[in-house]
Amino acid sequence: MEETNRQKKIGGLLQKDLADILQNSLRESGRTGILISVSKVRVTTDLSIAKAYVSIFPSKHQEEVIKEINENKSQIKHEMAQRTRHQLRKMPDLSFYVDDSLEYIDGIEKSIKGKEDPVANPDLLDKRKKS
């Protein structure tokens, strides 16, 4: 089902504010060398739940940063509610997920360019089939 205009607008608003809050919290905690971005926010049709997909670079810090974000979810929700109090009546419940789409794309590119190229070597297709 396609998102409505309202869902898209709220998702964009939440995405912008979430990115700002998460980057500020990383800066305040003294963690340097970690880049965090909110790649997508999907809001349910009743606007009660928002799923935020977060990209973290370098990827070796993904698990600990997501764990830290989930531990501070209530504080993040409160700050989001303060920022969006004039646009939203009720702040949706937030859930955070690691966005691994860039790694997935990178894996596809490596398999095409690397030695496991199924186009150049059709024998590899038999290995990839699910039994």
Curated annotation (Swiss-Prot):
GO annotations of cellular component type = cytosol
Protein keywords: Cytoplasm, Ribosome biogenesis
Name the InterPro entries on file. KH_dom-like_a/b, RbfA, RbfA_dom_sf
Identify the SUPFAM superfamilies for this entry. Ribosome-binding factor A, RbfA
The answer to whether keyword Cytoplasm applies is yes
**Domain of life the protein comes from:** Bacteria
| GO terms under biological process | maturation of SSU-rRNA
Pfam families documented for this protein: RBFA (PF02033)
Subcellular location field: Cytoplasm
Question: What Gene Ontology terms describe what this protein does at the molecular function level?
Answer: ribosomal small subunit binding
The reply to whether Cytoplasm figures as a keyword in the UniProt entry is yes
Q: What is its main location?
A: cytoplasm
Its quaternary structure?
Monomer. Binds 30S ribosomal subunits, but not 50S ribosomal subunits or 70S ribosomes.
Q: Which family does it belong to?
A: Belongs to the RbfA family.
The task this protein performs is described as:
One of several proteins that assist in the late maturation steps of the functional core of the 30S ribosomal subunit. Associates with free 30S ribosomal subunits (but not with 30S subunits that are part of 70S ribosomes or polysomes). Required for efficient processing of 16S rRNA. May interact with the 5'-terminal helix region of 16S rRNA.
Q: Could you tell me what this protein is called?
A: Ribosome-binding factor A
The scientific name of the source species is Christiangramia forsetii (strain DSM 17595 / CGMCC 1.15422 / KT0803) (Gramella forsetii)
Upper lineage is: Bacteria, Pseudomonadati, Bacteroidota, Flavobacteriia, Flavobacteriales
